[in-house]
Amino acid sequence: MALTQDELLAEFEGMTLIQLSEFVKAFEEKFDVTAAAAAPVVVAGGAAGGAAAEAEEEKDEFDVILTGAGDKKIQVIKVVRELTSLGLKEAKDLVDGTPKPVLEKVNKEAADKAAEALKGAGASVEVK
């Protein structure tokens, strides 16, 4: 029995960011595609309409930038690993090389949750 689009979306809503990240990687490998290729293309219409559409689209995607690890570097590395699918070395390199993006092009809710988790671990974070 095939799942409907609504059923798939309901399943995705119940997944964590890490699970979704792992799913995307598996999907990319299985079908030999990249998530970047699926990004919507903005077609320039009228000057006012195109500018309004771009401004609205920018509000939907946010980047979580780690600007500093603070005193609790190990805790920050643990949170980075929870938010991403990075290994220990990669997460440590990301934390050591601040400022670096932890999450890119995520919705407002996910960006706020990630920023709050990182701040709770003692990191300094920007959401752009």
Swiss-Prot record:
InterPro entries: Ribosomal_bL12, Ribosomal_bL12_C, Ribosomal_bL12_C/ClpS-like, Ribosomal_bL12_oligo, Ribosomal_bL12_oligo_N_sf. Disulfide bonds: none annotated. Keywords: Ribonucleoprotein, Ribosomal protein. CDD domains: Ribosomal_L7_L12. GO terms for molecular function: mRNA binding; structural constituent of ribosome. Homodimer. Part of the ribosomal stalk of the 50S ribosomal subunit. Forms a multimeric L10(L12)X complex, where L10 forms an elongated spine to which 2 to 4 L12 dimers bind in a sequential fashion. Binds GTP-bound translation factors. Belongs to the bacterial ribosomal protein bL12 family. This is Large ribosomal subunit protein bL12.
